[in-house]
Amino acid sequence: MAYAAERYITVIPEIDLPGHMQAALAAYPELGCTGGPYEVWRMWGISDNVLCAGNDKTIQFIKDVLAEIIDIFPSEYIHVGGDECPKVKWETCPKCQARIKALGIKGDSKHSKEEYLQSYVIHEAEKFLTENGRSMIGWDEILEGGLAPNATVMSWRGEAGGIEAARQQHLSLIHISEP
C-alpha cells in the first residue's frame, strides 16, 4: 500500500458478494444454502452456490471480511461486487425464504423477491461501510431490487446501468470493455 501511495495511486479492493463465493463456501460451508460440501473452482465461472442471504452468520461474515479489508486498504472506496449472483438456491432455501417473509419482501413485475433479497445483503454491506467511514462501489446488478443509499454503481454491461444510477442521484462509473 505504501508503494502505491508514494505514486499517488489509490488501490480500490473488490470482494465479490454474495455471488462468486465458491472458495469461501468451500472453507465455510455453513454460509451456503445447502451446507455443502463445496469445492474450490480451478477455473472462472458463475456458480449457483452463493452466500445464504437468510443466514445471520452470512451477514456477520460479510462484516468481518469488510472489516479486514478496511484495516488493510486506506481507500475511501471498497468494491463489493454484487454481480452474477444466481438466485436459484435462494428460491428453495428455507432460511432465505424465511428472511424474505420476515422482511416483508414482495416480488413485482420488475424484480423477483430474491432480487430484493440481494438488495438487502448489499444494503447491509453498504451500511457497515458507511458506519466505518467508507463508500461502496458495486457492479450495476446492485440496481436490481433497490440501490443502497450511498452506493456508487460501476456499470459493466453497458451505459444503461450508469444512466439509471445517475437518474437515482448516485455516482456512476461506466466500464468500457470494447474499443
Which residues does each predicted region cover?
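Residue-level detector of conserved catalytic or cofactor/ligand-binding positions
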Residues: 174-179
